[in-house]
Amino acid sequence: MPTWDDQQYLKFADERTRAARDLLARVPLDDAATVVDLGCGPGNSTALLVERWPQARVVGVDSSAEMLRSARQALPQVEWMQADLRAWAPAAPVDLIFANAVMQWLPDHATLLPELLRHLRPGGVLAIQMPRNYDEPSHRLMRETPGPWAARLAGARAIAPLPAAAWYYDLLAPHARQLELWQTTYEQVMDDAGAIVEWVRGTGLRPYLEALAEDEHPAYLAAYEAGIDAAYPPRSDGRRLFPFPRLFMVAVR
C-alpha cells in the first residue's frame, strides 16, 4: 500500500464518508459487542460506528501511523491498532468487520474475504465498499499520461481492476447465510479539474507520485490535470461532474 497523508485525504472528508454511511445503513445488526473498522484511515468511518453502537467496543485498524494519529485525536475512546491488514486477525470473533474503501488495495481477495468471514461470530456481518474506478478516466490517465515517466509509472504499486460482482457473490455465498451486493455511481460535483486532481492525490494517485522523483511531480501533475480537464468538461454552471463508481457487499455469517 502507498504512504498516506491524512490531511490530504481529509480535504474531502464529507464526500469520502458518504459511501461509508450508505454501507452502514445496510448492516443488519441491532446490537453489537465488538465492531472493527478495518482500514479505518483517519477515523471518519469509525465515528459512524461509534454513533450507531455507543456501548460497543470499537476497534480501528490501519497500516498507516499518520492516519492513526489523526484518528486518535478525533476519537480517543476508540481502541486503535496499527497492523498489516493482510495479516490482521481478532483475538476472538467479532460482531462486525467494516471495511470501507480499503480492500481494493489488498491482493488475493479469494483467500482474504472468506477468512474475514471466519473472524465473525454467528450472525456477525462483513461489510465492504470498494471504489470501482480502474477504467475511469481519472485512473486511466494516472497510468497513461505521456511523458518521460512512463516506464516508472508502469511499475507503480497501484490498485488492480476488481472482479465482477458475480465473482464476489460466488466467493462469499457458500460462507454466508445472507448476502447483498450492489453498485452505485456517485456523481460528485467538483469546482474544477484541479479539485479532481486534489481528490485523487489523497488516494489513487499516491502510488504514481511515489514512483516518481519529487522534482518530477509538478510536470506530471500538470500533464495529468490537462487530461482531467478534457475528460471531465465543465457543466452549465462551470463545475465538473466526477462520476465515482463503487461496489458494496454485506455478508451475514
UniProtKB/Swiss-Prot annotation:
The lineage of its organism: Bacteria, Pseudomonadati, Pseudomonadota, Betaproteobacteria, Rhodocyclales. CDD domains: AdoMet_MTases (cd02440). Keywords: Cytoplasm, Methyltransferase, S-adenosyl-L-methionine, Transferase. NCBIfam families: PRK01683.1 (NF002463). One of its GO terms (biological process) is methylation. This is Trans-aconitate 2-methyltransferase. The gene is tam. One of its GO terms (molecular function) is trans-aconitate 2-methyltransferase activity. It comes from the Bacteria. It comes from Azoarcus sp. (strain BH72). Belongs to the methyltransferase superfamily. Tam family.
